[in-house]
Amino acid sequence: NVKDAVKDADIIVPNKLIIDKSVLEGSSVKMVCEAATGYNNVDIDYCKNAGIRVTNVSGYSTESVAQHTVALLLSVYEHLDYYCSYVESGEYTRSKKFSHVDCQFHEIAGKTWGIAGLGAIGRQTAKLAQAFGAEVIYYSASGNAYDVLYQRVDFDELLEKSDIISVHCPLNEKTQGLFRADAFKKM
């Protein structure tokens, strides 16, 4: 039981556990240190009203998350699972053709990479996208992000102009349900 586990603690360090009134009420918790960059699992309003400070570990995974974003894109764009299976099956060595191109390859260079959320991870992803030769545009769900290196666009424009979209914004009331079916139809 989380409530019992935290009742006598001054500081708790959760990750993914729901930390809300039902957990915190009647406890001696003075600070919640979320062991992640996102903290949508913490009831911020309750904590604020109860005088409980909330922090996270912003920046701890910026490079690795941006790198993983590019790795996932390359896996999809280059059909890596398909081609790895093709080679591992022995079909490549048995083929009389010089090359096997049943699945089309895509170039990132020259594409428009749209980024939803230009915080630290979004900015790092933008740098990597540019290194591959992509033009970067971004949408700021909060309306607070401004960056002179990249063109800021509204959400619909991001959907319509982007060849690639990666999402790096926190899950909150402004972003929950942002990418619904109607958004995908605009892509």
Residue ranges and their predicted role:
Residues R53-G59, R152-F155:
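Short beta-strand elements at the ligand-binding edges of bilobed clamshell
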Residues S99-K186:
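Rossmann-like dinucleotide/phosphate-binding beta-alpha-beta segment
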